[in-house]
Amino acid sequence: MNYRMTISYDGTRYHGWESKKEVDTIEGKLEAVFARMTEQDVKIHGAGRTDAGVHAMGMVANGFLDTTLTPEEIKAYANHYLPDDICIRDVTVASERFHARLNAKGKVYQYTCYIGDEKPVFDRMYTWVLPEWVTKGTSDRIPDIEAMQKAAGYLIGTHDFRSFCGNNKMKKSTVRTIYDITIAEEEGYLRMTFHGNGFLQNMVRILTGTLLEVGYGRKAAEDMEAILAACDRQMAGPTAPPHGLMLLEVEY
């Protein structure tokens, strides 16, 4: 039977989502637990492949499990054996044709930066404390959020986002649709939320780095148009580190 599950995880100590030999991954941990439960090899399909160090609040996955356990019992069993930094939030029976990645209609990611005066001791694993090389030359650490939001406006819609793709050998289509980008600052935390139909490798992190360059005056908001048109990774800004990124939701 095909089961759909929603998963939260702290990606700090994992080499990303996708199973890899000899290193810990989220998918690998899940498959190992379900193999133990069913005494069979199990393949789990995630809605996306988050990079090493990236976190998720609402990753969706599916897998065929040969078991007599109820969904609630599957959830309880898995959470008992999974490490404390991975949690299955819910399990439901899905249609035989449901596939977490192929059926996904949209994703919401959030990137969090810290621009306050005090070290965010308890959030440091989930927040990028902006270093001096990002904020250098500005009178304070607070970026021009209005300029960043204006720049984000050029990204809304369907575009070729090759300039914002971390894989320069990408042969598949790099066209994606972004529905909305919101940027807000509160009590020293700068949060950028990206809602789209899908995202390329490192895309959200490169968008974040580029928007920060606008916020700190290294690029103009209007430059986004030329960056998109260039289809050249070198035109965009730096790739923000993974630990500030969180997958919030997958839409179906």
What are these regions (language model features)?
Residues M1-Y252:
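Structured-RNA-binding interfaces characteristic of tRNA pseudouridine synthases
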